Amino acid sequence: MDLQRVRALRGPNLWSRHTAIEAVIYCEEDERSIKGLVDFEIQLRTLFPKLHFSNAVSSHEHISMAHVIEHVVLGLQAQAGCPVTFSRTVKASHEGIYQVVVEYSEEAVGRLALDLAWSLVSAARENKKFDLQKALHELSNLDEDVRLGPSTGSIVQSSVERNIPYRRLTDGSLVQFGWGSKQKRIQAAETSDTSAIAEAIAQDKELTKDLLHAAGVAVPMGKVVDNADDAWKVAQELGSTIVIKPRDGNQGKGVAVNIKSEEQVRTAFEVAQHYGRKIIVERYMPGQDFRLLVVGDRLIAAARRDPPQVIGDGKSTIVQLVEEINKDPLRGDGHATPLTKIRIDDIALATLSKKGLQAESIPIMGQKVVLRNNANLSTGGSATDVTEDVHPDLAASAITAAKMVGLDICGVDIVCEAVYKPLEEQGGGVVEVNAAPGLRMHLNPSYGKSQPVGDAIISMMYPTPENGRIPVVAVSGTNGKTTTVRLIAHVLRTHGHRVGMTSTDGVYIENERIDTGDCSGPKSARNVLMHPQVDAAVFETARGGILREGLGFDACDVGVITNIGEGDHLGMSYIETVEELAEVKGVIVRNVAPSGHAVLNAADPMVVKMAKTCRGQIIYFALNSHHPVISTHRAQGKKVLFREKDEIIAAIGSKIIHRIPLANIPLTDHGQIGFQVENTLASVGAAWALNIDWKLIEQGLASFVSDAKTAPGRFNLFKHKGATVIADYGHNPDAIRALVQAANAFPANNRHVVISGAGDRRDEDIRLQTQILGEAFDSVILYQDQCQRGREDGEVLALLREGLVGAKKTKDIQEIRGEFLAIDLALEQLNPNDLCLILIDQVEESLNYLQKVTKP
């Protein structure tokens, strides 16, 4: 076996809507069926006893080593606790090549699972040992390390259930919800609306206490000190049991409670100063420790927190009892698990010492030993849900505390005897207000039921029916994508949207280019959706990006397929046929939202077949108003667009909805340029699907300018000494045919064409381009461009020349090296009333050159 390529498919893709690892594997002839591999399966199942082959692989005859890798990768992740179920192996047309696709929940885990699966299968093949438990432990640890923690994870899960898109921005807990101008962000239990001032107030415990006291909320009395002598002095003034804690602390770090003696005060002060210079000394409030979670202006959850403790068995030391408790799989070292491991640290030792105990002491049977007096989960405490027991007045105190500090999500710590009574009746009070509160105790309490805190946070950020989505239009096809994308974006701008757009010539935000080059892939789409000044997005969605990484979004409102025709880029990335190419481009149709539309070319059979995969509605378009697909769709009472004489017609069933004169659409040159009429139909379909007002659609079509600046390489017209020059990036047979048809609408004495060929296309596709041109042009200039894309020197020119053999119209054939030299040669030979079609390769450079050298 040979692992030839590994890719992470980070969005909906050719295989599924799941994120997945795609591996291209070459199998030797004897590896294409494990039936002939003696004892291989026995050894494989010895190393991996729970391996399961899916029903799709019915017998050993069909199980290749690539299939084995597939199922081992999936099985390892599943046994490590990852929520994965999808996998698939497809035999490519190349001999011995298989494409293996396996779902992952975390990319790093999926990649590691592939590495471990390769090692396991190799060990089985070579009759060697493999430590399965070590591999599963490694996968499980990595998954725990990289996946979202329980607090952030609960919020993300709630967003998924509400169909709110999300994107993880870092390896940590920073997550974006929504797209463009509707985006919001969280980091754990902080939101993009959480006030920095409020967080600073919450961090200053003395200031917080003053604000709450002013609002009539009960708080413990106390003072701030910066040395141990003053701490003891304040303790004496308070005249009771006290609490010592850092003024700017968090998560219960450095907190000591129930302090009485001078020695205890000084020890606690020293520990607290590890976490802050200023220390609070305040009156100790007897009672139980409760955490109330306030989201917005509502109390969402409440939990009683109990300090970390062990129960003696009469034979184990306290250290041993702690070690036994820490074996609980619910306890971990950080915040990824519901509970945190108990630590024997200085505070724990001091707490034991007050009871006359040490870490090596052996408690008697049934003796409860508390290891610290604060009950934070982050220091090993446990929680019991008491949400339904909270008295309305006590809830009101917690909400007032949150509002006084100014936090949108707030953890209010209250000490009192019971939550079913108001604070005033029991002498309790608010001891702390926390920004970014942990949610674990409410999601997975040790006792009681889980509370839907993630739902509450998402509902605060996006009240129903908001979902954080902006209109998203995805455009794919063989030809016409870029022009269609630009026209749709222009119409949306006419509607008042701030539009983000991606295409093969850049990324545009509000009509300003922010990135250059081919930006028709998922990375550019994600960048647009992350931009806060985008109200609507239009994406050119090319074959390469879909194959390389999948889509840059989970769903689109409109999916437009301009055409498939004879295809392009065939023979690349294991896509050999037009049918396979249609499967790739149809990914956007399969991922149209159920409430959305697919806008499909009714005249292209490959495009029409995509309709059955769409979850939304279909709008068909065609130049021919009587096309059978158009007629059938109309008969079913559905939406269609077509050309009728000199108008574009929008109809639902037999009812005409709107008419647009082609004379009012400059892009089509009064309807003379057929492929631009098709591009316009597709664009109007997208705008119609988004419920844009027809007057605004007409305004957008009338004001759209297609020139070398606004649509570079898309039928750009120049004048040179009385001749017409057309520059276009057409580079496949269908595009050439459309260009020939459009050029024929321009009267000319002589017709000239300048062409090169893309070396990464099939031989027959390169030949066919000049075969088509040879029927329509008097003279042809063949040029070799800078990049041959893997071809030998002169090889592309030879193929282009072969296509002109027997040409009916072409009489003059010239060859030259260099695109600009070819342009110069063509312009020199032009006479007034001639026409020259220049098929450019370096779009921006060639257009700039033409603007300089053409002389109207």
Question: Which ranges hold each PLM region?
Answer:
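ATP-dependent carboxylate-amine ligase
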Residues: 3, 11-58, 473, 486, ...
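Active-site nucleotide/adenylate-binding loops and adjacent lid/helix of ATP-dependent enzymes
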Residues: 67, 160, 184-344, 392
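Walker A (P-loop) phosphate-binding motif
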Residues: 464-506
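Adenine nucleotide phosphate-binding catalytic loops in nucleotide-utilizing enzymes
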Residues: 575-582, 586, 596, 615-737
